[in-house]
Amino acid sequence: MLYPSIDNLLEKLDSKYSLVTVSARRAREMKEDSARVPLVEKPKSYKFVGIALEEIVNDQLTKRVPKEEQ
């Protein structure tokens, strides 16, 4: 079984699209800037996307919704 499971991840974010967007953006941050260390102490994954997914399931990474201009 894969960790973290898609069911656990979808409890944290509202859609698969949001999940992919947030995890890809975070993975790119970690890859391009070595100062951005993982928020997870001992990640099970060695790939950036896997680490980002672990951060989401541990509530260390969430999606920000921009405020609409009125």
From Swiss-Prot:
Its EC number is 2.7.7.6. It comes from the Bacteria. It holds the Pfam family RNA_pol_Rpb6. One of its GO terms (biological process) is DNA-templated transcription. The keyword Ligase does not apply. One of its GO terms (cellular component) is DNA-directed RNA polymerase complex. It catalyses: RNA(n) + a ribonucleoside 5'-triphosphate = RNA(n+1) + diphosphate. The keyword Transferase applies. InterPro entries: DNA-dir_RNA_pol_omega, Pol_omega/Rpo6/RPB6, RPB6/omega-like_sf. Gene3D superfamilies: 3.90.940.10. Keywords: DNA-directed RNA polymerase, Nucleotidyltransferase, Transcription, Transferase. One of its GO terms (molecular function) is DNA binding. Disulfide bonds: none annotated. Belongs to the RNA polymerase subunit omega family. Promotes RNA polymerase assembly. Latches the N- and C-terminal regions of the beta' subunit thereby facilitating its interaction with the beta and alpha subunits. The RNAP catalytic core consists of 2 alpha, 1 beta, 1 beta' and 1 omega subunit. When a sigma factor is associated with the core the holoenzyme is formed, which can initiate transcription. This is DNA-directed RNA polymerase subunit omega.
